[in-house]
């Protein structure tokens, strides 16, 4: 665990290097407010690790989940600590709970589920923690009793939530779950608006004027007008031809009629002359 603590300090220093000037260990110890050592295998806290932990001046959250720790001895007293997480370890005695009361008197959240506590009455010790409002104890042997929450609420009056349920039996999300849910809601809303705006953009794109399309439409319109003009001209030509033919035919008929009339007049004159001649004789 000593290496994990030093690595965390070095990481903080690199993240807070300003203008090429490295942050100091003192800055890191004063500024770090949480130390998460989940999964780092250990059974107890060594003296070297204890001395390192003493350097943290403003630690508010300490997580030792799934480390296999069996005792809390050598973890220094941390008055600023608000959250202590010790789930899935090998803790089992009332002495562990007493140590928590003595050394972390201001904690508001204690997660100690998945350990080996068998006697629910041992937890009455925690009533000395006046700020404790959230307690996690599920997957301990005593929690097999379906009424364990009710019993804990009775001798821990300040506690508001046990294993995500309040005194009325209503489920209450943890702060981490609330943040995750808010993040999902924000993303859902964001995705909704992005999709909505995208649809609107797609609709707008459908109605964006296209100069080429306008030109094509104008060309097509011009072609149609030209075709109509040609059809009109062709029709006029045909009408003129029909008129000329009719005119010629009419003129031909009139000419024939005049020729026939002249012939008839000549014949009539001949007949008149013959008649006059006969009378003279």
Curated annotation (Swiss-Prot):
InterPro entries: AN32, LRR_dom_sf
Region (Disordered): 197-281
Family membership noted in the UniProt record: Belongs to the ANP32 family.
Keywords: Leucine-rich repeat, Repeat
Keyword Ligase: no
The organism's place on the tree of life at top rank: Eukaryota
GO molecular function: histone binding
Positions annotated as LRR repeat: 29-52, 56-78, 79-103, 105-128
Entries under Pfam families matching the protein: LRR_9 (PF14580)
Record-level GO cellular component terms: nucleus
Biased composition (Acidic residues): 197-244
Domain LRRCT: 140-178
Protein name from the UniProt record: Acidic leucine-rich nuclear phosphoprotein 32-related protein
Regions of compositional bias (Basic and acidic residues) in chain numbering: 245-266
